[in-house]
């Protein structure tokens, strides 16, 4: 996510910090120059030169522009900080929404896959049990047929044995000469008895197999019933999971739509932030321009102070030279001295006459600037009058 450029914020703090010192300088310049419009010297009023008045107006204009830029910079800084917080909150919200949607979807898919695997395993196991049951059913049917056959064979052997025994008894009663035939019949009867015993044993074994197969079949049928119940429950759970998955997908689409909306808002906020940062950069450029203008005004003021000092020095040296021209002996010099003195008088009282700025008159720059400009105005007016 986008982060606020620390250089931009540093520039904003620097702009706010530098504003205070420059604003003080401009206040000094504007106030000092504005109050040089009229200078009283006893009963006369000296009008400041147009250049001084123009500089005062320019200083006031620069000061007002500076105040407007200060407010604009503060507003831009507050807006940028607010938008940076909004961008961070929206970024976190988008990430949380996406993470929540992915988690729900993943959980639903995992549960659905697990249930599908469980249903598949139960279906395979049920099929195997049914095959085993069919095998036992076939075994039971075969054993039943064999038992029936053995029972028929046993019944036939019993009938034959009974017939042989009856025939033997009849021969015994008829004649002793039929001893051999009786022995033969007795041998056949013994064979039939052996066959009958073998058939009974086989019949017992077949019955045991039949009972085992029947019990196993019942057991498998019970397992099949249990598996079918589990399968039905798993299918119902699968239906519920599918519904949950559909709901999760719908929620995911909803969250994705919300995320898309938030991303659009985020892009719009980023664009607005970029515009504000561009305005802040323009404000910084305007600040540099105003600082340059303030510096130029300070340099002009210093130059005027130098000119004033030079004029005062020239005036002082001119006043000390004696007038050697004969025709000029009666030129009055006292008015000049009076004017000079009257010019000095306001300079001495300037500190008391300066407008109140909310502070005591202890600012050396303010005192020097105001005195210099006022003195410059008076001396220049005096010089212009003497030249005329």
From Swiss-Prot:
Q: Which keywords are on file for this protein?
A: Cell wall, IgG-binding protein, Peptidoglycan-anchor, Repeat, Secreted, Signal
The protein here is known as Fibrinogen- and Ig-binding protein
Q: Where is the composition biased (Basic and acidic residues)?
A: 322-332
Sequence positions bearing Pentaglycyl murein peptidoglycan amidated threonine: 357
Which locations, inside or outside the cell, does it occupy?
Answer: Secreted, Cell wall
**Annotated Polar residues bias:** 334-362
Q: Which domain of life is it from?
A: Bacteria
Region annotated Disordered, chain positions: 308-362
PROSITE patterns named in the record: GRAM_POS_ANCHORING, SMDRR
Q: From the UniProt annotation, give the residues forming the signal peptide.
A: 1-41
Spell out the molecular function terms from Gene Ontology: IgG binding
- Ranges spanned by the short sequence motif LPXTG sorting signal, renumbered to the chain: 354-358
Topological relation to the membrane, as annotated? Peptidoglycan-anchor
Organism name:
Streptococcus pyogenes
D repeat residues:
288-293, 294-299, 302-307, 309-314
Name of the gene encoding the protein in the UniProt record: mrp4
Please list the residues that make up the propeptide. 358-388
Pfam families, per database record: Gram_pos_anchor (PF00746)
What biological function has been recorded for the protein in this entry?
Binds IgG molecules of the Ig1, Ig2 and Ig4 subclasses, and also binds fibrinogen.
Q: Which InterPro entries match?
A: LPXTG_anchor (IPR019931), M_anchor (IPR019950), SMDRR (IPR049895), YSIRK_signal_dom (IPR005877)
- Among the entry's GO cellular component annotations, what is one? extracellular region
Q: Which NCBIfam families match?
A: LPXTG_anchor, YSIRK_signal
